[in-house]
């Protein structure tokens, strides 16, 4: 069933090239997905190189079985626990590069049984790991209207959040929603104005998905984890797909690259400043966006942003 859902890896070459792969290095693909980035990394590693992949989606773990390579291993779990996985392997501070491809994948969106898409009818689930936590239907059934409003506004910037939340609560009082099409139709009916070329449920589905999977908190923890496992000169390569994700990545790199704030004019070298603590990363190059050709081939790449950073010596 896995092969039925095609996945085109976004910014494939750019994201991997930014890792500056060393033949004998140790790398982490924190979001295996269907293995596009992992396969390219493996193709650039020598016999002594190693690649550790992570994914919390059981279908991704199943897809990884197709990679028969002694240099490769995969862990089923959230990338936010990266530091723990690496510590268990005794490799803290020895990782030469970490790649993160954030958000929901095409196979997750395209499989109606996963419940991520308002375009295809399926169970109202939305969990990246269906074996853990509450589904979207379960959460919506027990959530108060104010809680739903907060989620829709915070993670979806939905201006009709109150109308939609009220409609959800009223519907669930009479007959619980269990299908994606039910929720999408309800949101469309509750939205008085429609944006051109945008389904009324787009923002709400994004918001509920982000909340159900704790996506933004997971990203923050994953970035901290990457920082803790990287070796000096190790690279961080992160692809984000919407402004909420990119804002977290941008702020993290900026904060970690600023270092201690000291009065201007103090005669301190860069090494002395680093010894004060705080400056741990330096940005590498400018953010990258997909080319027009890539967007034409894969419209879902349109909103992607790729950022790089390099670990500074302690």
Swiss-Prot record:
GO terms for cellular component: cytoplasm. Residues 276-296 are annotated as: Disordered. GO terms for biological process: rRNA base methylation. It catalyses: cytidine(1402) in 16S rRNA + S-adenosyl-L-methionine = N(4)-methylcytidine(1402) in 16S rRNA + S-adenosyl-L-homocysteine + H(+). InterPro entries: RsmH, SAM-dep_MeTrfase_MraW_recog, SAM-dependent_MTases_sf. It is found in: Cytoplasm. One of its GO terms (molecular function) is rRNA (cytosine-N4-)-methyltransferase activity. SUPFAM superfamilies: Putative methyltransferase TM0872, insert domain, S-adenosyl-L-methionine-dependent methyltransferases. Pfam families: Methyltransf_5. S-adenosyl-L-methionine binds at residues 35-37, 55, 79, 101, 108. Keywords: Cytoplasm, Methyltransferase, rRNA processing, S-adenosyl-L-methionine, Transferase. Belongs to the methyltransferase superfamily. RsmH family. PANTHER family: 12S RRNA N4-METHYLCYTIDINE METHYLTRANSFERASE, S-ADENOSYL-METHYLTRANSFERASE MRAW. This is Ribosomal RNA small subunit methyltransferase H.
């Amino acid at each position: 069933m896995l092969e039925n859902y095609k996945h085109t890896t976004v910014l494939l070459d750019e994201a991997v090239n930014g890792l500056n792969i060393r033949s004998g290095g140790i790398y982490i693909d924190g979001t295996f997905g269907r293995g596009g980035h992992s396969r390219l990394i493996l193709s650039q590693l020598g016999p002594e190189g190693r690649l550790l992949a992570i994914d919390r989606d059981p279908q991704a773990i199943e897809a990884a079985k197709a990679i028969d390579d002694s240099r490769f291993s995969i862990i089923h779990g959230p990338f936010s626990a990266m530091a723990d996985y690496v510590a268990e392997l005794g490799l803290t501070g020895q990782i030469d590069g970490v790649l993160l491809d954030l958000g929901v994948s095409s196979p997750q969106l395209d499989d109606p049984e996963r419940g991520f898409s308002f375009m295809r009818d399926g169970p109202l689930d939305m969990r990246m790991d269906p074996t853990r936590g509450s589904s979207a239907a379960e959460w919506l059934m027990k959530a108060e209207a104010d809680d739903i409003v907060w989620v829709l506004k915070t993670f979806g910037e939905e201006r009709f959040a109150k109308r939609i939340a009220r409609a959800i609560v009223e519907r669930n009082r009479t007959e619980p929603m269990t299908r994606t099409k039910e929720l999408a139709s309800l949101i469309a009916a509750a939205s008085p104005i429609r944006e051109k070329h945008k389904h009324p449920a787009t923002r709400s589905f994004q918001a509920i998905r982000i909340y159900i999977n704790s996506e933004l908190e997971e990203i923050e923890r994953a970035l901290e984890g990457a920082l803790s496992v990287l070796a000096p000169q190790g690279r961080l390569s992160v692809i984000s797909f919407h402004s909420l994700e990119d804002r977290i990545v941008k702020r993290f790199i900026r904060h970690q690259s600023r270092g201690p704030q000291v009065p201007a004019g103090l005669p301190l070298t860069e090494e002395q400043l680093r010894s004060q603590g705080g400056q741990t990363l330096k940005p590498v190059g400018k953010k990258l966006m997909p080319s027009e050709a890539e967007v034409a081939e894969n419209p879902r790449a349109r909103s992607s942003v790729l950022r790089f950073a390099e670990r500074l010596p302690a």
